[in-house]
From Swiss-Prot:
UniProt GO molecular function: protein folding chaperone; unfolded protein binding
Subcellular location: Cytoplasm
Keyword hit for Disulfide bond: yes
Alphabetical GO biological process terms: protein refolding
Keywords: Chaperone, Cytoplasm, Disulfide bond, Redox-active center, Zinc
Function: Redox regulated molecular chaperone. Protects both thermally unfolding and oxidatively damaged proteins from irreversible aggregation. Plays an important role in the bacterial defense system toward oxidative stress.
Source organism per UniProt: Lactococcus lactis subsp. cremoris (strain SK11)
Name the UniProt record assigns to this protein: 33 kDa chaperonin
Disulfide bond entries: 236-238, 269-272
Family assignment from sequence similarity: Belongs to the HSP33 family.
Superkingdom of the source species: Bacteria
Reported modifications of this chain: Under oxidizing conditions two disulfide bonds are formed involving the reactive cysteines. Under reducing conditions zinc is bound to the reactive cysteines and the protein is inactive.
Main location: cytoplasm
Length: 288
């Protein structure tokens, strides 16, 4: 089971999340049949959305949009405060690796553009924040969002490691660290040093206790306490009934065309690839 550990330094000056999102990203890859570069980019965006969702409470939903001008096209992920996330990438068929190391390349295919974060708290108007993509690697872009839009100094690392022989997801996860208002400059410098000198995310994720390893490396000599473990999962909230309401909202004329030309309708959810079929009778019931 995927999970996130939330923690805070004992002096209350920093908080950090560590995530194992392996099954989440693996399911996304299987559902969308993504190629390696697309898998890593989508996976990082899903993890970023889970990080943001973990910051929220209640029924708030977070949408993360990576809107670059590269070959990848838009990457969209939607998460809630309960650890659920869904998402998709427009171009699923990108497979580019460094010849020397086999490292999957992401940023060149995301390109230049924007990271958009939308918070829907069930009020009339969702909150929306937007920053320029500074690297296209997604983790650094999310850290820039926290600093620019929420004035919170942060460090974010997200990654997806693929099996060399099959390009399936081997492991996926990441971390987020935030400095809270009482953090001193000296403490921030110490934490920055810890993060710069820590092993790669891939190395930590393949350790025996990946989430503890990440948190130990982040805090270094600073004492911290765990605030709890919480489950994470790929989960889409689509349903046949919800899409039926969407068809109904189209109005009489388009529905009559579906009945006359196709004798029914088929809808595929772009977030999870679930397929829903509607009979002629079900469509007629919408307009009678």
């Amino acid at each position: 089971m995927d999970k996130i550990i939330k923690s805070i330094s004992k002096n209350g000056h920093f908080r950090a999340f560590a995530l194992d999102s392996t099954l989440t990203v693996r399911e996304a890859q299987e559902r969308h049949q993504t190629w390696p570069t697309s898998t890593v980019a989508l996976g990082r965006t899903l993890i970023a959305a889970q990080v943001l969702g973990a910051n929220e409470k209640g029924d708030t939903k977070i949408t993360v949009k990576v809107l670059g001008d590269g070959a990848m096209g838009p990457i969209i992920a939607v998460a809630d405060s309960k650890g659920h996330v869904k998402g998709y990438v427009k171009n699923r068929e990108l497979d580019y690796k460094k010849a020397s190391t086999g490292e999957v390349l992401v940023a060149p295919f995301v390109g230049n553009g924007f990271l958009v974060v939308v918070k829907d708290m069930g009020l009339k108007q969702p909150y929306s924040g937007q920053v320029d993509l500074i690297t296209g690697e997604i983790g650094e872009d999310l850290a820039w969002y926290f600093l620019s839009s929420e004035q919170t100094p942060s460090s974010v690392g997200v990654n997806v490691l693929l099996n060399e022989d099959s390009d399936t997801v081997k492991i996926a996860g990441g971390f987020m660290l935030q400095a809270l208002p009482d953090a001193t400059d000296e403490e921030i410098t110490e934490i920055e040093h810890n993060i710069k000198s820590m092993p790669s995310i891939a190395t930590m994720l393949t350790s025996d206790e990946p989430l503890k390893t990440m948190l130990d490396n982040i805090y270094g000599d600073m004492e911290y306490k765990n605030l709890g473990e919480f489950p994470l999962a790929f989960k889409c909230d689509c349903s046949k009934e919800r899409f039926l309401e969407g068809i109904k909202s189209l109005g009489r004329e388009p529905i009559e065309e579906m009945i006359a030309e196709d004798h029914g309708a088929e809808i595929i959810c772009q977030f999870c690839e679930n397929k829903y079929e509607y009979s002629e009778e079900e469509l007629k019931a919408l307009i009678n």
